[in-house]
Amino acid sequence: MLNNEYKNSALKIFSLKGNEPLAQEVADHVGIELGKCSVKRFSDGEIQINIEESIRGCDVFIIQPTSNPVNLHLMELLIMIDACRRASAANINIVVPYYGYARQDRKARSREPITAKLVANLIETAGADRMIALDLHAPQIQGFFDMPIDHLMGVPILAQYFKNETDIDPEECVVVSPDHGGVTRARKLADILKTPIAIIDKRRPKPNVAEVMNIVGEIEGRTAIIIDDIIDTAGTITLAAQALKDKGAKDVYACCTHPVLSGPAKERIENSAIKELVVTNSIQLDEKRKPENTKELSVAGLLAQAIIRVYERESVSVLFD
């Protein structure tokens, strides 16, 4: 817990249904109780939200990842923003540990929507004033918003685990990006761990199907750490792990900020060359979806610090590294 000085302040933290354990942990770090609100369903599936305490003049922080079921959690968030606006909250801040639709950030083919931008429009129209986000799939999504975005990174949390809680020797380790787009992320982890990096040249013939083609970098005899922002069906990560093993990697670890883990992900990871999967709790994982060799790290402390700094009108940039 950081402190208790916010118990009777104008700082209010609310949780919807997206990740209640994470929200509770954040509130515990800040030193306040979660705000009282009810989220119910009508018999026809419509969402009803009721804020059960006064928030007039308060700085409200709504914690809600828009993870599976994406549309339901997104609608909960939009309705809660509207409720806070109509209840005269001074500032409505949304804390989105996982931003759904982030992979639809551009037109890859003709006549496709840019859904990440549409979601940004919906959030701003509903009345949000600021967003605290964690590892957006494409950092340029920040430009889809006109309101301030505090974009936090999960890499330091992952790095501290490998640095302090494993017996990996940095001199015999290599950080691997599963594609060219993740090189910046891999470089950041490698800089913290003081290791070299490698890149996997990947060809994706159709969605959710990946084929590993080539590895650029020294792999043989090293412990490889593959890092990505999202692991969804785990096709990319498991093929990458096998390719690294085939190139002589000693052990293969995989890590990500957002464990979507849909479809065959659990089975693929458990039957792969991956020794351990390291993830954060940005998305609430039930046991049915969690591979046996999974280590879950908490981002609650990071989010709590960001919330306090925003509330105190202090710089958040110190948390970016």
From Swiss-Prot:
The keyword Aminoacyl-tRNA synthetase does not apply. Its main location: cytoplasm. It catalyses: D-ribose 5-phosphate + ATP = 5-phospho-alpha-D-ribose 1-diphosphate + AMP + H(+). The active site is at K202. Its EC number is 2.7.6.1. One of its GO terms (cellular component) is ribose phosphate diphosphokinase complex. Disulfide bonds: none annotated. ATP binds at D44, G45, E46, R103, Q104. Its cofactor is Mg(2+). Pfam families: Pribosyl_synth, Pribosyltran_N. It is found in: Cytoplasm. Binds 2 Mg(2+) ions per subunit. Mg(2+) 2 binds at D179. Mg(2+) 1 binds at H137. Keywords: ATP-binding, Cytoplasm, Kinase, Magnesium, Metal-binding, Nucleotide biosynthesis, Nucleotide-binding, Transferase. GO terms for molecular function: ATP binding; kinase activity; magnesium ion binding; ribose phosphate diphosphokinase activity. Pathway: Metabolic intermediate biosynthesis; 5-phospho-alpha-D-ribose 1-diphosphate biosynthesis; 5-phospho-alpha-D-ribose 1-diphosphate from D-ribose 5-phosphate (route I): step 1/1. D-ribose 5-phosphate binds at R204, D228, D232, T233, A234, G235, T236. GO terms for biological process: 5-phosphoribose 1-diphosphate biosynthetic process; purine nucleotide biosynthetic process; ribonucleoside monophosphate biosynthetic process. The keyword Magnesium applies. Involved in the biosynthesis of the central metabolite phospho-alpha-D-ribosyl-1-pyrophosphate (PRPP) via the transfer of pyrophosphoryl group from ATP to 1-hydroxyl of ribose-5-phosphate (Rib-5-P). Homohexamer. Belongs to the ribose-phosphate pyrophosphokinase family. Class I subfamily. This is Ribose-phosphate pyrophosphokinase.
